[in-house]
Regions:
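Terminal, non-catalytic protein-protein interaction segments that mediate quaternary/complex assembly
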Residues: 1-202
Length: 202
């Protein structure tokens, strides 16, 4: 409970061979969020099971794209007006959420600029350490990089990801044990994956 992970968003991506990651889905989901989309048809080609979480088969009730799209102008204006503002927050959680198969796991994203670096505080009500965490870290880093590119001259800082409940489902326990066992000897740093040189339209 109340678990926090701190990640340097400037560091190269790290992969472990024992942990198979859907890299196409990871990239597609980040682009899907940044575009403000919530349609099933645009993300389903990259995941065979994701459509099962849609209530009507057409849209996702808890998609992060629409709140990101709608609140991004406020965040950019807020940080441009006062780079030390503590009010640059995107709210993902819905007041009085209705019953749905797609309740958002993330409550909010707060963006803080300190010493010319943008830091992100992600507050999550629930975080699946196996299935969701690796994608959440990537998505929040992409969102932060997107904002930094639009602010110009701002570098990426740290991602503080705090989860009310960070958990591992029983069905993923054995796979997680294998990753922990090989972590020391099979960690791979991919130095080619970096945000450097990107532009807002990339």
């Amino acid at each position: 409970l109340g678990h926090q992970t701190v990640i340097d968003m400037e560091r190269p991506f790290v992969t472990i061979p024992a942990r198979k990651i859907g890299n196409k889905f990871r990239a597609a989901e980040a682009a899907w969020i940044l575009s403000g989309d919530n349609r099933v048809s645009t993300i389903a080609p990259y995941s065979t099971k994701i459509k099962d979480y849609s209530d009507d088969g057409e849209y996702f009730a808890g998609a992060y794209g629409p709140p990101f799209r709608d609140q991004l102008p406020y965040v950019l204006n807020c940080l441009r007006a006062d780079s030390y503002s503590r009010q640059a927050v995107i709210s993902i959680w819905r007041p009085r959420p209705y019953s749905s198969k797609d309740i958002p796991c993330t409550v909010s994203l707060q963006f803080l600029i300190r010493h010319n670096r943008i830091h992100t505080v992600a507050t999550m009500r629930s975080s699946d350490a196996w299935l969701g965490w690796v994608y959440d870290v990537h998505n929040f880093s992409c969102i932060s990089a997107f904002i930094a590119l639009h602010l110009k001259g701002v570098e990426l800082g740290a991602l503080f990801l705090t989860a009310g409940s960070q958990h591992l489902y029983e069905g993923n326990t054995e796979a997680a044990k294998k990753v922990i066992k090989c972590y020391e000897t099979e960690i791979v740093y991919n130095k080619e994956l970096t945000w450097k040189g990107m532009k807002p339209d990339d």
